[in-house]
């Protein structure tokens, strides 16, 4: 390790010990040495013994800085790996850090755009509107039309810091995976790899711009969701410019009530927006925490959601969507056999899974949920319970489903915060049933025909050539198969000859032994010679 890495590692260990995180080390013969070393560091005692372990972990990550804050946020979404007393406090981590100098931000933007800001913008505010671990946001006006915009710029020198901390995370994850068999279930290296990908994706604002453009297109002219316009002429890897919006933060309940917002409709529209993104578009905003969601103050009787920060999105393929919809419907119909079979059919659990045992396990976990009224049942926790049960049957981690479950928990939490009586099932069931109905029957056939017809017509002129190639390949394949079959038959014949000669040779050798005992040496020698010759011919036949 380099001196800088050792210094950073000491800082990380120091913070962990000051928050008593050595409690996370399991009782194991391999952890005795670290625990003994910990006792020798008498000056690094747990200074927060009055706090719960989950809260101490949250505070430690917050003190270690941006990379670790985001890592904690990701850990909070992996409830299939971490228990509630760890995941719940981590969900409260706030990605807010001190801003860097606004003049430096202005200089960075000018370097990326290749000219002074005054060329395109007026009233650039040196004071940032918001500051997070990866980027910060400033406001300005477009010189051409006076339109209010926001300029998002990646923090300077953030990449080396991320690379250094990720490298240390990998080192620790590999040590933990090798040294502690109990920790392998958590797949520490895979968790770090998933986090690294998420973090590096957020460093490229072109990706966020593309996501925002796609989401805006999907909800164009929609009364339910508005996505600010991205000004692509001013976007690159480290700078993104978009329309500035004025709204009420979704967590500001007092402000929403003061504006006369229809809270019931707003909550129901949040559910509708989520299921529309998932099942209609197969493309959903996967970071819908309250800081990224606002409400349009205009027309409060017909409220509209506003979605910001599209850095993290999720996608589902058609098979995942179908299995997910059928899982929800089967669960709420209490058809646990169907739920178990769907997990096997989808490939989420191994094909050799005992469906009967899996059904019993799902029933034991899910049946108590129905002790509550349907309106109190959490969709997100239903998914969580299903995934946790499936993990016992070797279900592989499905990243797209983890993102979906996290987003569903956000949307559901926001919806019930806005309108506690929100019946998520009554809101979602018609949507799911309608979507499933569109996947089967004449309407689904016509839809599939409509989608594929242009491709078929495009390929029709190539059909004769494709048919000729297929026939030619078929003839060549038949010839190769015939040659293989003839070779197989010849091999079988040779093996049969070899077996026959081996048997004759063995018989003659036995006979030679009998004739020797009866003083018939000439016959014995001749018989043995012919027997050995038969064995040699048999060996030759097998070799061929």
Curated annotation (Swiss-Prot):
One of its GO terms (biological process) is ubiquinone biosynthetic process. The active site is at residue 287. Its EC number is 2.7.-.-. It comes from the Bacteria. The chain crosses the membrane at residues 496-516, 519-539. Belongs to the ABC1 family. UbiB subfamily. Is probably a protein kinase regulator of UbiI activity which is involved in aerobic coenzyme Q (ubiquinone) biosynthesis. This is Probable protein kinase UbiB. It comes from Vibrio cholerae serotype O1 (strain ATCC 39315 / El Tor Inaba N16961).
């Amino acid at each position: 390790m380099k001196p800088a890495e050792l210094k950073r590692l000491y800082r990380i260990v120091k913070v962990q010990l000051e928050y008593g995180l050595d409690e996370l080390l399991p009782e194991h013969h391999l952890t005795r040495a670290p625990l003994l070393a910990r006792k020798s560091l008498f000056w690094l005692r747990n200074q927060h013994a009055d706090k719960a372990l989950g809260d101490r972990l949250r505070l430690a990550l917050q003190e270690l800085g941006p990379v670790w804050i985001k890592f904690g946020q990701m850990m909070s979404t992996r409830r299939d790996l971490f228990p509630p007393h760890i995941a719940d406090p981590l969900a409260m981590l706030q990605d807010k850090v001190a801003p860097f100098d606004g003049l430096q931000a202005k200089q960075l933007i000018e370097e990326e755009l290749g000219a002074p800001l005054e060329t395109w913008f007026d009233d650039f505010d040196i004071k940032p509107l918001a500051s997070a671990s990866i980027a910060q946001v400033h406001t300005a006006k477009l010189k051409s039309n006076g339109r209010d915009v926001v300029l998002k710029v990646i923090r300077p020198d953030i990449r080396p810091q991320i690379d250094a901390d990720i490298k240390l995370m990998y080192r620790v994850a590999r040590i933990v995976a090798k040294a502690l068999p109990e920790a392998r279930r958590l797949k520490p290296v895979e968790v770090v790899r998933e986090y690294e990908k998420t973090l590096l994706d957020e460093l490229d604002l072109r990706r966020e711009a593309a996501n925002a453009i796609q989401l805006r297109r999907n909800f164009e002219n929609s009364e339910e969701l508005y996505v600010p316009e991205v000004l692509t002429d001013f976007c690159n890897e480290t700078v993104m410019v978009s329309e500035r919006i004025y709204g009420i933060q979704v967590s500001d309940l007092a402000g929403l009530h003061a504006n006369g917002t229809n809270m019931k409709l707003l909550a129901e529209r949040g559910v509708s927006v989520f299921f529309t993104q998932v099942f209609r578009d197969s493309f959903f905003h996967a970071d819908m925490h309250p800081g990224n969601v606002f409400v349009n103050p205009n027309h409060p009787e017909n409220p509209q959601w506003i979605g910001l920060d599209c850095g993290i999105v999720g996608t589902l393929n058609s098979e995942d969507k179908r299995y997910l919809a059928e899982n929800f419907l089967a669960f709420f119909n209490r058809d646990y056999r169907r739920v178990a079979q769907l997990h096997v059919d989808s490939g989420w659990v191994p094909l050799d899974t005992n469906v009967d045992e899996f059904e019993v396990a799902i029933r034991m976990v899910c049946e108590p949920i129905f002790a509550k009224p349907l309106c109190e049942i959490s969709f997100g926790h239903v998914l969580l319970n299903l995934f946790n049960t499936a993990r016992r049957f070797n279900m592989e981690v499905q990243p797209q489903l983890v993102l979906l479950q996290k987003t569903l928990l956000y949307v559901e939490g926001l919806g019930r915060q806005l309108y506690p009586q929100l019946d998520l099932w009554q809101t979602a069931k018609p949507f799911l049933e309608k979507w499933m109905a569109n996947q089967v029957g004449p309407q689904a056939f016509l839809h599939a025909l409509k989608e594929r017809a242009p491709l078929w017509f495009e390929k029709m002129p190539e059909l004769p050539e494709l048919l000729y190639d297929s026939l030619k390949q078929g003839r060549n394949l038949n010839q190769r198969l015939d040659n293989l079959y003839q070779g197989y038959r010849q091999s079988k014949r040779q093996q049969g000859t070899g077996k026959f000669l081996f048997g004759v040779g063995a018989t003659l050798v036995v006979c030679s032994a009998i004739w020797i005992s009866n003083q018939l040496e000439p016959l014995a020698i001749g018989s043995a010679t012919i027997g050995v010759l038969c064995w040699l011919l048999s060996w030759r036949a097998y070799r061929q």
